[in-house]
């Protein structure tokens, strides 16, 4: 992507990546290819060098330090593919990752990013109500996934278990904001979050006094 790092962060960024490579005893490219079950060629097709570094350090943080990671790249660097790669990683490791974003139209964006990295087969369970704005569309505008009908959706919320037909979860922050008056969705997300991977898009907009994220 031919990106640059601010001078004030360049040394620290380089050292952080180098420390991870020393700890894992391999370079980040090899490490990420192994964790995402890619050949070296397919990894290069799916992720740029910058994205590989981000994914590698995120996976290292999860597996070794039991911590998360914040991706603070500017627009155009490809944070969506990093998020998609982490969803792929979670699914490959027996989890049902939870993707949370600010607006439902971003469900389509994450699906397209998953498509770009060769993971369009991963099936989302949409927490939001079934309506046109929550539909997931491919690059041609065709609807490929929709939220379940309300009766089936509510059944899943109540049993707090994801059926085998789904691989990961999509929700907006607004679905988590009514835990007092409408607790069923927040309770479901809370139950599903245990020992799981959360991918929080636009997470800086999830905090504050607003109840809508």
Language model segments and positions:
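SF2 helicase/translocase NTPase motor core
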Residues: 4-46, 67, 80, 91-213
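Walker A/P-loop
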Residues: 66-86
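Active-site signature of alpha/beta-hydrolase-fold catalytic machinery across serine-
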Residues: 56, 85, 89
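N-terminal pre-P-loop "Q-motif" helix
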Residues: 44-67
